UniProtKB/Swiss-Prot annotation:
Statement: the UniProt record of this protein carries the keyword Signal: no
Coiled coil stretches, renumbered: none
Name the record gives this protein: Phosphatidate cytidylyltransferase
Annotated Gene Ontology cellular component terms: plasma membrane
Major localization class: membrane
Keyword Transferase among record annotations: yes
Organism: Mycobacterium bovis (strain ATCC BAA-935 / AF2122/97)
Membrane topology, record value: Multi-pass membrane protein
């Protein structure tokens, strides 16, 4: 999840050759409509807080809907780039991976994921593509099977499988606390990276992937993310401050890596955002890029340190 185009956030991606240019709009220095981003972010935050406090199991339904929307966003972008992606088994399999965690936990998530991948591999064998690959004449497309399936499996891991780990966070007795701990860490990391990166960012981290991510912004992410996690881990999940500090480092790293992965994917596809669902943010996947790997990390820690 990232609101940033500086520090540890997403860059204003440079479109690949032939990609459509997006019209310029009034934005902040980071390249976003800051006012819209704040309003949307606060609205989503208030809804999630209410759910986690009063009806925590509804979190699973929210994750399931997010899985559906984010998967569709990425599939659409991949198809625009010429990949032949089996969307129906991805959408259905993603729901299976999330909902099977309710009765079966991690076993259900892995079963849903494994079944989804197998069905996608078979489904792709019989897909027709007379639009982006017209030479097939409407017959099953024999070319690019490996690249299409590789992109499909990557997407299945990136969104449905990672989302299923996010759903499992809420099941333990203190599950809401763990979700809050992870979410607050990601938000604090983003905000700290944005502020410090915009004000002081001079040394790019990975200029070939994301030119506006700076080491100064990453330092801001570390300070804010670790501080927030120490507080939330101590008071919400009953961990010692040193465990909170380690969790903070872990969450900041997973958030930054998630941002970089999505930045690389968008650079490969020649796009700036995955979608337009959330004003000031882009698509839903542009909000989830840092959250998803952090959810996996949080579940692993929760499992190893109950």
């Amino acid at each position: 999840m990232t609101t940033n185009d500086a520090g540890t956030g997403n860059p204003a991606e440079q479109p690949a050759r032939g990609a459509k240019q997006q019209p310029a709009t009034e934005t902040s220095r980071a390249g976003r409509d800051l006012r819209a981003a704040i309003v949307v972010g606060l609205s989503i935050g208030l809804v999630l807080i209410a759910v986690l406090v009063f009806v925590p199991r509804v979190w699973v339904a929210i994750v399931a809907v997010a899985t559906l929307v984010a998967t569709h966003e990425v599939v659409r972008r991949l198809r625009e780039a010429g990949y032949l992606i089996p969307v129906i088994p991805l959408l259905i399999g993603g729901q299976a991976a999330v909902w099977l965690t309710w009765p079966f936990g991690a076993v259900g998530a892995l079963a849903g994921f494994g079944g989804m991948v197998v069905v996608c591999m078979i489904w792709r064998l019989f897909m027709q593509d007379s639009v982006t690959r017209p030479t097939t004449g409407g017959a099953p497309s024999p070319g690019n099977y490996l690249s299409d399936v590789s992109a499909t499996v990557f997407l299945a891991v990136w969104v449905p499988l990672f989302c299923s780990f996010g759903a499992m966070l809420v099941y333990p007795e203190n599950g809401s606390g763990w979700v809050f701990c992870m979410m607050i860490a990601v938000i604090a990391s983003d905000v700290g990276g944005y502020a410090v990166g915009v004000l002081f960012g001079k040394h790019p981290m990975v200029p070939t992937i994301s030119p506006k991510k700076s080491w100064e912004g990453f330092a801001g992410s570390l300070v804010c993310g670790i501080t927030a996690t120490i507080i939330t881990a101590t008071f919400l999940v009953g961990k010692t401050p040193w465990i909170g500090a380690l969790l903070g480092v872990l969450f900041v790293l997973t958030t930054a890596l998630g941002d970089l992965v999505e930045s690389q994917v968008k650079r490969d596809l020649g796009i700036k955002d995955m979608g337009r669902l959330l004003p000031g943010h882009g698509g839903l996947m542009d909000r989830l890029d840092g959250i998803l790997p952090s959810a996996v990390a949080a579940w692993i820690v929760l499992t190893l340190l109950p």
